[in-house]
UniProtKB/Swiss-Prot annotation:
CDD domains: CUB, EGF_CA
Name under which the protein is recorded: Fibropellin-3
Taxonomic superkingdom: Eukaryota
Biological classification of the source: Eukaryota, Metazoa, Echinodermata, Eleutherozoa, Echinozoa
Residues annotated as domain CUB: 62-175
Annotated compartments: Secreted, Extracellular space
């Protein structure tokens, strides 16, 4: 088999650049495969893992992952009955997909017991499910129409109890990506994406499915009078033979059209030539020669004469003016001498005779430089030769002591204290609970503000004038996604204590879960810390599930994000 030099070169380029894309840093974990995209990547996880980088162990005991553009999702053993106590996870990840459409072809599960939930994104979380399906939908003619999700990633969770298994479900899917990436259209064409197809809208001058063909505008022989046609993009150019011009060489050239005759001369056109009839006062082939009126040397006092048509202009030397440069200019007319100095006029110049204690070309320099009191803000002026030096009071700087030194520039106030600049001093206005010249002394623990626990969940506490504490709560996942379930937080602290105890309750998802924290605010190694005990209560549907409805645990909250501890759901 023969391999072209171009193919070898392309393979070399691919080999040299492989691994320099988004997958170059090997972001995918736990044996997953990284698929590079334009500015992004997608991880094809091994069974039992999900998350953007396949870094989250799901604990699923059935299901599978699909990475093709079309496929089928079926319950275990389908069409035979599925197993009891199944906990299945199906990941659908299709690189480059913009829309994934799912069609339920068959569905039969035990209603209120065995449910299928689906959602989008890298993490399968039933709290983020878009819909839930359960029951014998096929037999009851309740199969929903096809539904679609945006993006490259979707997930399905199927869980069963220990009673009455059924045959389960069969769901097919297909995806539509961006068929315009990479752009197949050539020569500046615009690509319009369609469903698993594209259309090229060609730039003027091109045709073909991919606009690969340049239209030959010379095919119609547009050039006349022997002109040679040169094809261009969306146009053509005619190279005319001598004597003709125009877009199509349709015009006989008029040699007088460029108005070659100067100074009002009249042009008479000929064949490839012309002749000029000159006005009086001009001569030459193009009437280019003017009669010289400067021949009589009319300009005086060394002025330079410039000839014009039937006239002349004198360019006078410095110090003279007039039509023929006959007048000496009086440079003292503008009174240039300052501070009472006398002006003596000369030729193109003047001399100032200064009064005592003044000097300079215009008598502008006072020999007593401190006479004008240049030093500001109490600075002391000292004459130094013809200049002065200002000795500034403490707190000021600058040539004239005009700058107030900002003692707050070094940010001396600690722990959020506000710095107020003074003259050669500063004052720190400390936040409540802090003292000292620089607010360096901590006196108590303040509940108000933002706190982070070991999982980097976040609570924000606001204390009202009545003593009640309000605020909100966001999980780390919600912070990462920028979307949070609606929450209501309320609580009360113990009053008039430096290290208060407190209790707060957060209601999430319109009452679906309620979490209560109790604890006390401490100062540990100079840092504010909340140590809390929590209990979480979740709404459930059955008596069996109520055994798992309550969870308890402990949290340590700090003012800064902490290193990750194990996640509760992992």
């Amino acid at each position: 088999m023969k391999v072209s030099l171009l193919a070898v070169l392309l393979l070399s380029i691919v080999a040299a650049t492989y691994g320099q894309g988004e997958c170059g840093s090997n972001p995918c974990e736990n044996g997953s495969v990284c698929r590079d995209g334009e500015g992004t990547y997608i991880c094809e996880c091994q069974m039992g893992y999900d998350g953007q980088n396949c870094d989250r162990f799901t604990g699923a005991n059935c299901g599978y992952n699909i990475f093709e553009s079309t496929g089928v999702i079926e319950s275990p053993n389908y069409p035979a009955n599925y197993n009891n106590r199944a906990d299945c996870l199906y990941l659908v990840r299709i690189k480059g997909a913009r829309v994934i459409t799912f069609t339920i072809e068959d569905f039969a599960t035990e209603i209120f017991k065995d449910a299928v939930e689906y959602g989008v994104g890298p993490v399968a979380d039933f709290n983020q499910a878009l819909a839930t399906f359960e029951g014998n939908l096929t037999a009851n003619n309740q199969v929903p129409p096809p539904f679609s999700v945006q993006g490259e990633q979707a997930w399905f969770i199927f869980s069963t109890d220990r009673n009455i298994p059924r045959k389960g479900f069969r769901i097919t899917f297909s995806s539509d990506g961006d068929d315009c990436t990479p752009n197949p259209c050539l020569n500046g064409a615009t690509c319009v994406d369609q469903v698993n197809d594209y259309q090229c809208i060609c730039a003027p001058g091109f045709t073909g499915d991919n606009c690969e063909t340049d239209i030959d505008e010379c095919a119609s022989a547009p050039c006349r009078n022997g002109g040679a046609c040169v094809d261009q993009v969306n146009g053509y150019t005619c190279n005319c033979i001598p004597g003709f011009n125009g877009v199509n060489c349709e015009n006989n050239i008029n040699e007088c059209a460029s108005i070659p005759c100067l100074n009002g001369g009249i042009c008479v056109d000929g064949i490839n030539q012309f002749a000029c009839t000159c006005l009086p006062g001009y001569t030459g082939i193009l009437c280019e020669t003017d009669i010289n009126e400067c021949a009589s040397s009319p300009c005086q006092n060394g002025g330079s004469c410039t000839d014009a048509v039937n006239r002349y202009t004198c360019d006078c030397r410095a110090g003279f003016t007039g039509s023929n440069c006959e007048t000496n200019i009086n440079e003292c007319a503008s009174s240039p001498c300052l501070n009472g100095g006398s002006c003596l006029d000369g030729v193109d110049g003047y001399v100032c005779q200064c009064l005592p204690n003044y000097t300079g070309t215009h008598c502008e320099i006072s020999l007593d430089a401190c006479a004008s009191l240049p030093c500001q803000n109490g600075g002391v002026c000292t004459n130094v030769g013809g200049d002065y030096v200002c000795e500034c009071l403490p707190g000021y700087t600058g040539i004239n002591c005009e700058i107030d030194i900002n003692e707050c520039a070094s940010l001396p106030c600690q722990n959020g204290g506000e710095c107020i600049n003074g003259i050669a001093m500063y004052i720190c206005q400390c936040r409540q609970g802090y003292a000292g010249v620089n607010c360096e002394e901590v006196g108590f623990c303040d509940l108000e503000g933002v706190w982070f626990n070991e999982c980097n969940d976040q609570i924000t506490i606001i204390k009202t004038s009545t003593g009640m504490m309000l605020g909100d709560h966001m999980t780390f996942t919600e912070r990462e996604l920028g979307v949070a379930a609606p929450t209501v937080m309320v609580g009360y602290p113990s009053n008039n204590y430096d290290f208060p105890s407190f209790g707060i309750t957060v209601v999430r998802d319109n009452g679906r879960t309620t979490t209560s924290w109790t604890g006390q605010c401490h100062l540990c190694d100079g840092q504010e810390v909340l140590y809390t005990t929590w209990i979480e209560s979740s709404m459930v549907s059955t008596c069996e599930e109520i055994k798992r409805a309550n969870k308890v645990g402990q949290d340590k909250w700090t003012r800064y994000e902490q290193s990750f501890a194990p996640q509760p759901d992992a």
